[in-house]
Each structure stands twice: as C-alpha cells, then as structure tokens.
C-alpha cells in the first residue's frame, strides 16, 4: 500500500510553528543553512495559512449572502 503524503498541519498548529520559527530566526543564533531551511519552512507555513484564511473568508461570505437559495459549493482559491 502506497504511503500518503503527510497532511498539512491544522491552521493553529501551523501558526504556532511559524511563531517558533520567527523566534529562532530573530535570535540570530542559527547557522546560515539552518536559517535558510527555517525561512523556507516559514514561507510554506505562511502561504498555507493565507490560503486557509482566504477559504474561510469565502465560506463566511457565502453563508452570509442575502440569497438564501444560493448553493454552497467548495471554494477553490485558484479560481480568484
């Protein structure tokens, strides 16, 4: 059986990890390669968080729309 790719961390978990990365980077104690690796991870987490927030915002807009008969459908961030 093929292994599945690891699931993206939950928003709150990703945010917590991102905050820890920022603290480590701001300390200035990391070697260059490790700092770059942490920075890359932080960028991925920030982008994932932004996408999650955009999807949540779209869901809220749909739920609060005036059209009670409007169908709810999955939001695809790539459509915008």
From Swiss-Prot:
Annotated Gene Ontology cellular component terms: cytosol; exodeoxyribonuclease VII complex
Enzyme class: hydrolase
Family: Belongs to the XseB family.
Signal peptide feature range: none
UniProt GO molecular function: exodeoxyribonuclease VII activity
Function (record text): Bidirectionally degrades single-stranded DNA into large acid-insoluble oligonucleotides, which are then degraded further into small acid-soluble oligonucleotides.
Subunit-level organization: Heterooligomer composed of large and small subunits.
Catalytic activity: Exonucleolytic cleavage in either 5'- to 3'- or 3'- to 5'-direction to yield nucleoside 5'-phosphates
Protein's name according to its UniProt entry: Exodeoxyribonuclease 7 small subunit
Gene source species: Edwardsiella ictaluri (strain 93-146)
Subcellular location(s) of the protein: Cytoplasm
Keyword line: Cytoplasm, Exonuclease, Hydrolase, Nuclease
UniProt EC number: 3.1.11.6
GO terms of biological process kind: DNA catabolic process
């Amino acid at each position: 059986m093929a292994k599945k790719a690891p699931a993206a961390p939950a928003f709150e978990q990703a945010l917590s990890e991102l905050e820890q990365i920022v603290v480590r980077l701001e300390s200035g104690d990391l070697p260059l390669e490790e700092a770059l690796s942490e920075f890359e991870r932080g960028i991925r987490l920030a982008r994932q968080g932004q996408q999650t927030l955009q999807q949540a915002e779209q869901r809220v807009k749909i739920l609060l729309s005036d059209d009670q008969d409007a169908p709810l459908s999955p939001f695809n961030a790539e459509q915008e």
